[in-house]
Curated annotation (Swiss-Prot):
Listed InterPro entries: GAS8 (IPR039308), GAS8_dom (IPR025593)
Induction details: Expressed during serum starvation or contact inhibition of cells grown in murine fibroblasts.
Descriptive protein name: Dynein regulatory complex subunit 4
Summary of subunit composition and partner proteins: Component of the nexin-dynein regulatory complex (N-DRC). Interacts with microtubules. Interacts with SMO. Interacts (via coiled-coil domains) with RAB3B (in GTP-bound form). Interacts with DRC1. Interacts with DRC7.
Region called Regulates microtubule-binding, residue ranges: 1-114
Disruption phenotype: Mice show primary ciliary dyskinesia (PCD) like symptoms including situs inversus and hydrocephalus. Hydrocephalus starts at postnatal day 5 (P5) and becomes more pronounced as the mice mature, eventually leading to mortality between P14-P21. Development of hydrocephalus is associated with severe impairment of cilia motility on ependymal cells lining the ventricles of the brain.
Coiled-coil features, chain-numbered ranges: 24-207, 242-426
Organism from which the protein derives: Mus musculus (Mouse)
Positions of region (Microtubule-binding): 115-258
Superkingdom of the organism of origin: Eukaryota
Tissue specificity remark: Highly expressed in adult testes and lung. Weakly or not expressed in other tested tissues.
Chain positions covered by the region annotation Disordered: 1-29
This protein's GO CC annotations: 9+2 motile cilium; axoneme; ciliary basal body; cytoplasm; cytosol; extracellular region; glial cell projection; Golgi apparatus
Chain segments carrying region Interaction with SMO: 357-478
Amino acid sequence: MAPKKKGKKGKAKGTAIVDGVAPEDMTKEQVEEHVARIREELDREREERNYFQLERDKIHTFWEITRRQLEEKKAELRNKDREMEEAEERHQVEIKVYKQKVKHLLYEHQNNLAEVKAEGTVVMKLAQKEHRTQEGALRKDMRVLKVELKEQELANEVVIKNLCLKQAEEITKMRNDFERQVREIEAKYDKKMKMLRDELDLRRKTEIHEVEERKNGQISTLMQRHEEAFTDIKNYYNDITLNNLALINSLKEQMEDMRKKEEHMEREMAEVTLQNRRLADPLQKAKDEMNEMQKRLGNHERDKQILVCTKARLKVAERELKDLKWEHEVLEQRFIKVQQEREELYRKFADAIQEVQQKTGFKNLLLERKLQALNAAVEKREVQFNEVLAASNLDPTALTLVSRKLEDVLESKNTTIKDLQYELARVCKAHNDLLRTYEAKLLAFGIPLDNVGFKPLETAVIGQTLGQGPAGLVGAPT
């Protein structure tokens, strides 16, 4: 710290007259003393000059450092601005690139859709064309066979008549055998279908009954658990409230006892004071009694401090009681809200499962009806074909040719039936995937599957292997 300037201006003015005496009138001692003071003042001025020079150098150094730091910060700021501009340019370039990629993806998606639609149309047209070609070929073959049959009838009437009798007998036998076999097969498969339908109906009713029982049991158990939890919480807070009330009452009783003790001590102190005034003569006895009273007074002060602490504890207990009541109300509201959310989520899940099961059952019913209609059509075509063969009296070669063509037609129909069975399996797989998705959602929301109340029924198709992949990945029919 710089030394203080003491009387600098006064000293400057006192060079002419020092202590009321001119320099020429001073003695040697006065002059020496004056010179010593001037030297001290000169040394002090030199110290101040050196101090101010150091301060000036420090300030100049600080200014240089600050100026360099300012230039560095400006350079950093310019670099940051340049980096921000470059980053913005790169960002704009990336945005353009991503927009271009999105355009390309949209274009490819549209092209793929158009190709898929075109392929589907072409496949459908080819299938229709193939069916028309097969139908024309069959009609043409029938006409050719009729022409050949007429030619053979004209050329070999006698042989044909004899053969017709034999063939009629054999055809009658074969027809009777075929009709008997058809009736047996129909009766057999009707019986199997009826048994299978009855078994499936019984299984479905049993599973529905079990699901309803489990659901009702779980709902009652869950409601009982919630009621028990609510009763426990209510009893817990009631116990806390009763304990706090008991504590408050006990503290109030203690405070009342302290107040009574304080009044009693004050009365005793007043009595002692009166006795002290009356009994001034026996001084030693009065001193002893005074010491005893001082001890009692100290006890009284301690009792007052205990009373203050008790009041503070009473206030803290009242605040805790108020906080616990508020927490109890908040927990009751949260419990009611959580119960309402659980009931709403359970209702939505049950509605969604019921809707999905209805849709899936309807689709399965439609596919089964289509399959039954195709089977009936195939059986009808077989009967018609047998009747045509019986009426046409074809030779074995022509019969073999017609049978082969009929087998091709039947194979195409069987392929259609397999496709329908595959479609039915795919729908069942989609239904099962939807059930697993709902189960995953329930687990994600923190709802255990056991608390749902029922187990959704997964569907299966006889002859199909339902994998664990997406709905489109269904195993081939076995």
